[in-house]
Design a protein with these regions (language model features):
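Active-site-proximal alpha-helix that buttresses catalytic centers in soluble enzyme cores
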Residues: 1-72
Length: 72
């Protein structure tokens, strides 16, 4: 299973973190054949952290993870 990990900085403002989660959901709706799962991860201030997200990838059986940095 190939996972796209959308990595953002994270914010103390919950609204900003929700925007990243929403973006990950929108990318997943495109049904890009290369990725079975799209999930967000955050550098700081929000969950899941990058490490937690990679652990989640292992739990769901990912065989490949592509990290897409999304920093503004």
């Amino acid at each position: 299973m190939h996972v796209l990990l959308l990595v953002a900085h994270g914010s103390r403002r919950e609204e900003s973190n929700l925007e990243i989660e929403s973006l990950a959901q929108k990318i997943a709706l495109f049904k890009v054949k290369e990725f079975e799962v799209v999930m967000p991860a955050f550098l700081e201030f929000a969950k899941p952290s990058i490490t937690e997200a990679i652990d989640n990838c292992t739990v769901i059986g990912a065989t490949k993870v592509t990290v897409l940095p999304y920093f503004l």
